[in-house]
Amino acid sequence: MGKKIYDFLFFIFSGLCHQISERSFCGIGGYQFFVCSRDTGTYIGFLLSFIIIFLLSKFLYKDKNYINNLISSNIKIIIFLFLFYLSLFGIDGITSYSKLRETTNYIRYFTGLFMASHLGLIFKYFELSINKALYEQSDNLNNKNFSKSNFIKFILLFNFSVLIFYLTSLYIFLPYLLYLLPIAIFFYFYKIIKLITDLIYFQVSDLNNNYLNLLPYIVFIALVFLLMFFLFSLGYLKESSIIEIYQRVIK
């Protein structure tokens, strides 16, 4: 990664994170990651969930609708698991910031990775629900009642896959995550913006008005520009604020 590209990405992502060096991993050449280890786990974990779903659908179940139905039929359990990992995420952050205990970048990365990977499953559920409502995919998503054992096998395999990624990324290819991280961050915000525009499209899809049907695309473009403006603005404003607060209050 070229120095100019790195500096540009480090700047635009500075609005997302404090970027404190001791709370961040380092990549090849000693380059600090664009966000802290906890946020690194969050963004990569979100992307990882969609990769795991794709790989399992392609090579194990060989039917994308099988996993889609498992997710749709067991969303309450998935939300419970997400809240469990979110509590670990929050407890680790709160107790370390309040100096009740010391934590490590490995723990920060772990809590972010597992929390966000299950957040990805919830996002997948919302995408499936919207697509089903928009395109009436009742044949593909039939909400068939799968046995709990099928879902348990899937969720265990999913968590095992996340764990394997966690261990291998730490001990084998951690420095190379620096290259994956920008993709994961952009993917995260792309999914959020797309979900918002899909919801808008769902609201106007029944209206026979060509101009209104263009509204979701206009909103998508506007949100992208708004996000970039937000990132650049925070990048300029943040330099002398977050670090000062950290040095005076937390350190």
Predicted regions and their residues:
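Secretory/periplasmic and organellar redox-cofactor proteins
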Residues: 2-32, 37-251
